[in-house]
Each structure stands twice: as structure tokens, then as C-alpha cells.
Amino acid sequence: HTEKNAFAKGLYSTLKVPANLTKKILVKGTPLLFNETLWASAMAMLTQCYSIRGLNVVASLNISNTINNVFNIVFIALGDSVAIIVGQLLGAGDMKKARDTDNKMIAFSVMCCTCVAMVMFVMAPLFPMLYNTNDEARELAKYLIMITAFFMPQNAFLHATYFTLRSGGKTIITFLFDSVFIWCVSVPIAFVLSRYTGIHVLVIYACVQLADLIKCVIGFVLV
């Protein structure tokens, strides 16, 4: 088998990790570690900003986030596939094919998520009925799901471009593209609108989603 899989020769002969390999892992992996940590804390901060509008908002966010996570599987899976397939082509040194494949996969991801978003938008009034809560929370959850469905194609594009950048090894750029952007743009928008204005939480939520259009432009240029 060593002739067919030369890379596996001596794979289990030692647990020692060469220093130069460790350095490469740390250089590439550390930004991703910080990125995920900052992204999670940003999500918590956004939720806190929305929660200022009352307990019904908290309940509606829990409902909508649960439903959103089910439907988001589509663009998450397609984004992961971009990283795998494009990363393989980049590793083989076929830049032209990698770029062509990436463009097609991004377009496919956006089209698939557009179809899923339509289903999600139409079914939005039904999902909150599954939960034992008051009518106001159900109504808010319905509109939050609708807003998320409206922006799902945008999120599909962002996710695919994010994993395209990661597959190319541009971890610093993905760090800036993802968590730095959300802390510097999305969180301040939610913070200011929730604390210094009286606008409805649905408008705040939509404004935060709309801000990601800036990332779409950046992602389009970088990819």
C-alpha cells in the first residue's frame, strides 16, 4: 500500500511533530482560533443588544435562531464543500480550474439557498406555533424568520467566499473578513440603534443583516 499511498509511509512511526510543521500550524491556525472566539462573543453581544427591547424579543430570538439553524445547514454544507473541492484544486496547482469551479459553486450555493429561503419565508408563520409562548413573541419570531430568509442568499454568498479565502490559506484575511468586521460594523450598529434610538427591534435586526452587503462587496473583490 505504500506505493499507492506514499504519504502514509511512516505515518505511525513516531508521535513527534517537527518544529517547522508546528510553527506552520500555529501561524495558520491561531487566527482561525481567535476568529471563532471573537465571532461567538460578537453573536452574544448582538443578542444582548436585541434583548434590550424586552423578554418577548429574547423568546422570539430563541425560536427564530432554532429554525434558522435548521435551514442554514444548506449554505453551511455548500460552503464547506467549496473549501474541500477548491482547496484540493489549489493544492494541485490548477489555479484556472480552481477559480472556475469556485465561481460555479458559489453561484450554485446562492441559487440553492434562494429556493430554500422561499420555502422558509412562506412557512415562517407556522414555525412559532410549535412553541408554548405568547402571541407577541410568536409574531416577532415570524418576522425574524422572514428577515433571515430574505437575507439567506446573501449569507450563502458570504459563507462560500469565506471558505474560498480559507481554502487559499488566507487566514489573516478571513479573520478580518469575519470577526473583525462583525465587531467593527455589525455590533456598533446594533449597539447604537438599540440604546440611542426607539426604532423597532425588527428594524435593528434588518439593519445588521443589511450591513453584511459591505462584506459581499469585499468578498466579491477578494475572490
Region locations from a protein language model:
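Short runs within selected transmembrane alpha-helices of multi-pass transporters and secretion channels
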Residues: H1, I76-G79, T148-S167, I173-V185, ...
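Helix-terminus/linker motif at the lipid-water interface of multi-pass membrane proteins
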Residues: T37-V70, Q88-L89, L126-D135, R195-Y196
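Membrane-helix interface segments
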Residues: N56-V57, T171-I172, H200-V201
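Transmembrane alpha-helix boundary/anchor motif
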Residues: S41, M45, N69, S81, ...
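Hydrophobic faces of transmembrane alpha-helices in multi-pass small-molecule transporters and flippases
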Residues: T14-M45, V70-V74, L78, I145, ...
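Hydrophobic alpha-helical transmembrane segments in multi-pass membrane proteins
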Residues: L32-A44, Q48, I76, F108-F121, ...
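Short alpha-helical transmembrane segments in multi-pass integral membrane proteins
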Residues: H1-T30, V86-F151, L193-V223
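Small-residue-rich hydrophobic transmembrane alpha-helices
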Residues: S60-A124, N155-T174
